[in-house]
């Protein structure tokens, strides 16, 4: 089975806590995380930065040892786009919900700097950076919808009916992203216009974080409920035996 997609904690925990369903056969997973949808769409036209480019932009001496170090590197992976014929497309909405971006004036390539408001110390030369990049801010809801449509179309280019599973990220237990909670509607709007599209959702009243603290990582039971709720939407479980 080949799974492709764009996602982060939602996708990863969904697979981890439902692994008995996805590992009946050999599983090949190509998930590009820590990227917004526009980063992937842009790659098809402009390419992407590589690690050596990031070394010129970011101060890795400051970053090394921090979680943001590996996350910043992950934002340039594009393995999912190369897969010719996936069996399942797996997405979540956290990247578009969370990241603000900067766009390179010369190459039109985009990156994010960090999760915090200001981390100038992450950059080798902040003054040079703001001369070379334009601040894009957040994606709008409408931009995100269009990007998901384009991304799914690309993934489906050789398998037009490839099912999409979209893991919904809920913000009610994480105040930092609550101002972007309207992104929870995205999978429902996409489902109206994209066939063979399934939503990994859970009853919000049952939401609990895995460690009892504020966050976006939920319990095993929550992710298992997301899987079980696919069936009522018509998801063909026989695909998981492929």
Where in this protein do the model-derived segments appear?
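Extracellular glycan-modifying ectodomains
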Residues: 1-242
């Amino acid at each position: 089975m080949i799974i492709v997609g764009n996602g982060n904690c939602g996708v990863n925990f969904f697979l981890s806590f439902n692994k008995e369903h996805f590992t009946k056969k050999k599983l090949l997973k190509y998930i590009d995380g820590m990227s917004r949808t526009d980063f992937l769409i842009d790659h098809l036209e402009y390419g992407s930065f590589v690690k050596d480019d990031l070394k010129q932009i970011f101060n890795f001496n400051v970053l090394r040892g921090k979680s943001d170090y590996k996350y910043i590197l992950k934002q340039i992976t594009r393995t999912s786009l190369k897969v010719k014929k996936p069996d399942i497309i797996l997405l979540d909405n956290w990247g578009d919900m969370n990241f603000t971006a900067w766009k390179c004036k010369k190459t039109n390539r985009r990156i994010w700097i960090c999760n915090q408001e200001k981390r100038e110390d992450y950059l080798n030369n902040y003054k040079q950076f703001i001369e070379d990049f334009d601040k894009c801010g957040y994606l709008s809801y409408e931009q995100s919808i269009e990007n998901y449509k384009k991304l799914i179309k690309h993934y489906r280019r050789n398998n037009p009916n490839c099912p999409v599973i979209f893991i919904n990220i809920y913000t009610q237990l994480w105040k930092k992203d609550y101002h972007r909670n309207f992104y929870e509607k995205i999978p429902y709007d996409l489902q109206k216009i994209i066939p063979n599209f399934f939503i990994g959702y859970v009853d919000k009243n049952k939401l609990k974080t895995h460690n009892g603290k504020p966050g976006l990582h939920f319990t095993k039971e929550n992710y298992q409920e997301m899987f079980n709720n696919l069936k009522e939407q018509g998801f063909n479980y026989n695909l998981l035996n492929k």
